[in-house]
Amino acid sequence: MDKSEKRFERDIESFLISPAGGYTQFCGQDAEGNWVHTRQHDVSKCIYMDVLCEFIAKTQPKEWTRYTKYYGVQAVDKLYHRLEKAISNQGLLYVLRNGIEDMGCKLKVCFFKPESDLNPVTVERYEANILGCTRQFRYSTA
């Protein structure tokens, strides 16, 4: 009898990536059974920057164009450092609610469910949120 939490973990993941859960699976198993990321997970930063940039570009194209025009090839790295600083200084909930601002660009990192569906733009932005599911990571300080 398996006394580990693997079955429990698998059940949670199965629900989250089902149509009812609404999440996208960010990792899967290869032919040898090893877990591999389907998105670009940055281990040192512990974030999927490609997913965040995709979300911002899709939901806030004008701001993202301005941001990338200003920073050029460094845009993704600058975004990460600004995000990290904002979370450290103001807290994660503040950043989720208010987004970040850098060089005059206001960038939201998520959109909350609108009170009503009268404004189709707010509904569209809410539905554009990218919720990802990744199996737990092995952590080591060694």
Please state what every model-predicted region is.
Residues M1-A142:
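An alpha-helical interface "stripe"
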